[in-house]
Amino acid sequence: MKTTLALLACLCALALAAVEPIPAFTPNERVLFQGDSITDGNRGRSADPNHILGHGYAFIIAARHGAGFPERKLDFTNRGVSGNTVLDLEKRWAKDTLALKPDLLSVMIGVNDHSRNVPLEAYEATYDKLLTDARAQNPKLKLVLIEPFVRHPGKPVPEGIVARQAIVAKLALKHGAALVKLQKVFDDAAAKTADDYWVWDTVHPTYRGHQLLADEWERVVREYWK
């Protein structure tokens, strides 16, 4: 039993040692994840620390870097809300984003805007305003924008999603944000196995898919702020 515990401790230590620091994560920073259900990840709505970050990519990133670099005293917060469009996000932006005063803000929004036919013009204008307001509050704010994506086996990506991906890329360039492009990541992964291995309902990642998302997020953010 003691040998097994010692082995597990060694494996955990090796896993943490393999984590590379992200330059964008400076000591005492608050990292805020915003978005819809993919970000929400069934997060807790109370102070219970067991579930406060949810069970998705935000949790993976926070756990890896919170445990890997405790001396940095990073604060990871998740305010994703299942079902949100950018119009819903606008209604709670002051309370759930600006009031939290993040140092790094990551946003993933758009798939519900597509399914609910939010006009592209409204999607872009509202998203742009939210980012402008966040930057006005903190000129040094680091922004990460994650493009919406879907997986429809054997079908092309819907035009509405493609259009929103282009808008997110445009806004990332305008606001000096790191851009996390997921469509190709999941398309490439799906080419190696069944779609539902990564995304179980064309929209929501499985735990494996969340790991893919977290890995790509970290890769892009690490590269953007070297």
Predicted regions and their residues:
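A short, compositionally biased domain-edge/stem linker segment
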Residues: 14-24
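Active-site beta-alpha turn of Rossmann-fold NAD(P)-dependent dehydrogenases/reductases
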Residues: 35, 80, 147
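Short glycine-rich His-centered loop
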Residues: 23-51
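Alpha-helical cap/lid subdomain in secreted, periplasmic
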Residues: 22-27, 55, 59-75, 84, ...
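Bacterial N-terminal signal peptides
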Residues: 6-15
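Positively charged n-region of N-terminal signal peptides that target proteins for export
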Residues: 1-4
